Amino acid sequence: MAEQTASGYIQHHLQNLTFGHLPNGDWGFAHTAAEAKEMGFWAFHVDTLGWSVALGLIFVLIFRMAAKKATSGQPGALQNFVEVLVEFVDGSVKDSFHGRSAVIAPLALTIFVWVFLMNAVDLVPVDWIPQLAMMISGDEHIPFRAVPTTDPNATLGMALSVFALIIFYSIKVKGIGGFIGELTLHPFGSKNIFVQALLIPVNFLLEFVTLIAKPISLALRLFGNMYAGELVFILIAVMFGSGLLWLSGLGIVLQWAWAVFHILIITLQAFIFMMLTIVYLSMAHEDNH
């Protein structure tokens, strides 16, 4: 931190470890934001992909362990925790999903736990994971963004997956004709065929915007909240490095207070992402507009 400007420190912590096609024709890691930008579309954020997969595996292993040790007798702490979590998600699905599908509850559970784990990485001190990446790589300037949900590519990827399910179930339940009719015959209608035909472009524009807004808002809400939270942690670290917080006790209070508040944020954002997914899929299962 001492060798970096505040701006450089912030940019370094908010830059992804990007692997792609370098300008010289080789494949490798970008060391600057400019190099990452020049890689174009076929660039991979290795840190985001790595943490997402690793946390997904942790989720699977924990629940597999709980399932293998499940007993009808005196349950252990892990089984109690998993049962409470499953009942909470199951109750949320029953309250908000009005169709019939064996997929929705497991999907909601996966989304809630996975997003929560990805958000929770934000509670790790901002320099720990990047420093570990530097030690492993031997490169003091390697960028590394530890929190997957601060990468819009991750949140948009999850949102587009939900969007694909919305389209799939809309067509499955309503049929192609019903899906097209939902986009073109509502919200405005008329018994006059000529007037109805004139209203089709207006209806399509309104319904299409509403449909596309679902994944975009889903992705940007999660990304915006987590990015802002990570930025606050980084700014507190910058203040330490700048000597502005010469009272270490005040610094500890700031870090602790924001971390405690952030626990609420990471949980709430995981819950909101899950609930909106349930609601959107419930709307897709409704046969009537």
UniProtKB/Swiss-Prot annotation:
F-type ATPases have 2 components, CF(1) - the catalytic core - and CF(0) - the membrane proton channel. CF(1) has five subunits: alpha(3), beta(3), gamma(1), delta(1), epsilon(1). CF(0) has three main subunits: a(1), b(2) and c(9-12). The alpha and beta chains form an alternating ring which encloses part of the gamma chain. CF(1) is attached to CF(0) by a central stalk formed by the gamma and epsilon chains, while a peripheral stalk is formed by the delta and b chains. NCBIfam families: ATP_synt_6_or_A, PRK05815.1-1. Belongs to the ATPase A chain family. The chain crosses the membrane at residues 43-63, 101-121, 160-180, 193-213, 232-252, 259-279. Keywords: ATP synthesis, Cell inner membrane, Cell membrane, CF(0), Hydrogen ion transport, Ion transport, Membrane, Transmembrane, Transmembrane helix, Transport. This is ATP synthase subunit a. It is found in: Cell inner membrane. Its main location: membrane. It is a multi-pass membrane protein. GO terms for molecular function: proton-transporting ATP synthase activity, rotational mechanism. Key component of the proton channel; it plays a direct role in the translocation of protons across the membrane. GO terms for cellular component: plasma membrane; proton-transporting ATP synthase complex. GO terms for biological process: proton motive force-driven plasma membrane ATP synthesis. The keyword Cell inner membrane applies. The gene is atpB.
